[in-house]
């Protein structure tokens, strides 16, 4: 739906927006099929070196512009000899009361958050009370749609200079963690329709945050070593390191369909690779084997692509209708409940 909507919003028109969706579905299937009989998905990466066009330019700009030191300069400052968050409209951080800060910090001990961290893996490290000492806690506000209505915090760890590049040693190597409450997924509404489903689901994931972290680790090749779970105030929170290279690509930069299509191909290949990496079932066949078999014939791929494009177009129209309805209701204060 997003691919179709961005195409329409950028003036491509219905035909080219539908073509972009078909480009996605075709590339997705071909990418999955290319992984049958090999493990190439494990080494796939999207970098400036492996990309082209505007996406490559964007990745190069982010890499050159951002750094761990610059991130700490933006979000933190040294107060009375200790680093702390800057709470302002610019950082979108707000102060929390002392009791809440203490409860959050308590959740980040060895037997809490520490127990959920990987023991072996990329950049994984043994627990160190000094390194994982919580220096400050702030509430994150005004973030994306996925964060509305859920608790979200930034937690500042003391860290060490060894964790950053030489150019950033003066920053002290502090680590910023993004901590967000994880609500139940849509599938939770149907879990339990069959006897034993709820118990099976609970045996896989002790809480929803553990489910989200397991998914993140399965989908990425260089899994975030700080990805884990923190439980406080009766809720389970997903913990991730805030990447210094966090940025959003501006889709309005595309001037032609060809540029947009190349971007869609890159997104489709990335999505397909993540799905292949994250497959759970190994027998009787893996995800890539099932997809390859289901879409072996060209007519099957074409039928699926056209169906996805139709759903995307209908979904967009429904969202527009829903928004217009909500906007009209919001503008008519007399219709609001007393």
Please tell me what each predicted stretch does.
Residues 55-147, 156:
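Acidic catalytic cores of enzymes that act on phosphate-bearing nucleotides/polynucleotides
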Residues 1-54, 58-61, 122-331, 338:
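Conserved ATP-binding subdomain of kinase catalytic cores across diverse folds
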């Amino acid at each position: 739906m997003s691919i179709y909507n961005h195409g329409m919003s950028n003036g491509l028109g219905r035909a080219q927006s539908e073509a972009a969706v078909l480009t996605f579905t075709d590339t997705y299937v071909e990418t999955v099929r290319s992984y049958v009989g090999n493990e190439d998905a494990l080494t796939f990466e999207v970098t400036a070196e492996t990309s082209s066009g505007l996406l490559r330019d964007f990745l190069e700009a982010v890499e050159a512009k951002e750094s761990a030191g610059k991130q700490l300069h933006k979000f933190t400052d040294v107060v009375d000899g200790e680093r702390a968050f800057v709470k302002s409209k610019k950082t979108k951080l707000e102060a929390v009361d002392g009791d809440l800060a203490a409860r959050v910090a308590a959740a980040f001990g060895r037997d809490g958050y520490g127990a959920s961290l990987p023991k072996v893996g990329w950049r994984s490290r043994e627990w160190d009370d000094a390194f994982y000492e919580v220096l400050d806690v702030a509430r994150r506000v005004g973030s994306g749609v996925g964060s509305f209505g859920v608790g979200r915090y930034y937690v500042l760890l003391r860290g060490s200079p060894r964790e950053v590049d030489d150019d950033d040693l003066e920053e002290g190597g502090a680590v910023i963690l993004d901590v967000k409450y994880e609500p139940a997924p849509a599938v939770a509404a149907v879990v339990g329709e069959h006897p034993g489903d709820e118990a099976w689901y609970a045996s896989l994931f002790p809480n929803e945050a553990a489910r989200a972290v397991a998914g993140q680790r399965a989908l990425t090749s260089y899994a975030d070593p700080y990805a884990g779970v923190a439980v406080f105030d009766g809720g389970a929170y997903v913990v991730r390191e805030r990447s210094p290279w966090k940025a959003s690509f501006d889709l309005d930069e595309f001037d032609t369909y060809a540029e947009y299509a190349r971007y869609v191909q890159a997104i489709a290949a990335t999505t397909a690779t993540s799905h292949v990496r994250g497959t759970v079932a190994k027998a009787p066949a893996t995800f890539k084997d099932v997809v390859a078999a289901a879409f072996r014939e060209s007519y099957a791929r074409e039928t699926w692509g056209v169906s996805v494009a139709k759903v995307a177009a209908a979904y967009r129209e429904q969202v527009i209708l829903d928004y217009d309805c909500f906007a009209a209701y919001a503008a008519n204060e007399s219709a609001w409940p007393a």
